[in-house]
UniProtKB/Swiss-Prot annotation:
It holds the Pfam family YgbB. Binds 1 divalent metal cation per subunit. This is 2-C-methyl-D-erythritol 2,4-cyclodiphosphate synthase. Homotrimer. The keyword Lyase applies. 4-CDP-2-C-methyl-D-erythritol 2-phosphate binds at D15, V16, H17, H43, S44, D65, I66, G67, T141, T142, N143, E144, R151.
Length: 166
């Protein structure tokens, strides 16, 4: 039996950040207002949606995770715009001969209500990946007041990416 590289690859990503005062709340590149004035804590802009998508893209090609490329110990990534980091991850994927078929993600947060911002998130992510907005799925759900997301201690995101050999 001969070995061949499949023409499709799938990757999973996950990220979570703590909600804290005096930080911006950025999701999918959009600056949002939390009713309690909270934002996500992190070395970069802490955009859990974009971080989960980056990890899914990297995972599809067994390239590690975003911490390998943008370590929080490196001062150059302090306050970094995650959409700019996403462009770098996509360039890495393309340099290895792969293209993005689609990405799909689910945000888990009690507040703020995310539905009014979903289309803007999808468009911003699609632009940075270089795909049409209908190739970027973003959904939001609550955790029914269970766990850290339910207690509004943080926001998390799960993502999946499908890649195709170019």
């Amino acid at each position: 039996m001969t070995s061949s590289v499949p023409s499709l690859r799938i990757g999973n990503g996950y990220d979570v950040h703590r909600l804290v005062p005096d930080r911006p709340l950025i999701l999918g590149g959009q600056l949002l207002e939390h009713p309690a004035g909270l934002g996500l804590d992190g070395h970069s802009d802490a955009d859990v949606l974009v971080h989960a998508i980056m990890d899914a893209l990297l995972g599809a090609l067994s390239l590690g995770d975003i911490g390998k490329y943008f370590p929080p110990s490196d001062p150059q990534w302090k306050g970094a715009d995650s959409l700019v980091l996403l462009e770098q991850v996509v360039a890495l994927v393309k340099a290895r001969g792969w293209g993005v078929v689609n990405v799909d993600a689910v945000l888990i947060a009690e507040r703020p209500k995310l539905k009014p911002h979903i289309e803007a998130m999808r468009s911003a992510i699609a632009l940075r990946i270089g795909v049409a907005p209908d190739q970027v799925g973003v959904k939001a759900t609550t955790n029914e007041q269970l766990g850290p997301e339910g207690r509004e201690e943080g926001i998390s995101c799960q993502a999946v990416a499908l890649l195709q050999a170019l």
